[in-house]
Amino acid sequence: VRACTKKSTAALHAENYTPVRDHSKCIGCGECVINCPTGAWTRSKEKYYRLAIMGRTGKKNPRLAEDFLIWADEESIIKIIVNTYKYVEQYIDKNAPGGKEHIGYIVDRTGFEEFKKWALEGVELSDKAIMMNNVYWSGIKYPNV
């Protein structure tokens, strides 16, 4: 419980000397597994991934990436990445400086729904996967920049 609180998201707390996990806070980091003194917590043989999208750095328009999928399997993530390359090839601004454009700008221009349509083409998510219906980017917004 202490390792989760100090090193991660404080998803664990004790009730009657028993660790209880808050699944809404758990990010699957494994600190509980590594630090459990009794070995009661174990990692599943299955691997799951979190896919955060469209974060970018820079002075003009930085923005934090936001979760698109959580608890997705590896096969789904690979298919989504391949599909994302196809999406970029279709929608990249050929007149962008150096022929390069950050994918975040492409998604801004085409809309999240269009990106989602391309990214999920032919992808069957497991029952455990959670997909965000909308993504609202946070971060600093500079006026007139």
Each PLM stretch: what is its role?
Residues 1-21, 31-48:
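Iron-sulfur cluster-binding cysteine motifs and their immediate structural context
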Residues 2, 79-89, 101, 113-117:
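A broad, structural surface signal
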Residues 12-15, 19, 49-60, 107-108, ...:
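Extended, compositionally biased low-complexity polar/Lys-Gly-rich tracts
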Residues 35-95:
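Mobile "lid/hinge" segments at catalytic clefts and subdomain interfaces of large enzymes
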Residues 90-107, 125-134:
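Flexible, glycine/charged-enriched surface loops at secondary-structure junctions
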Residues 113-145:
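Long C-terminal interaction/binding lobes of large macromolecular proteins
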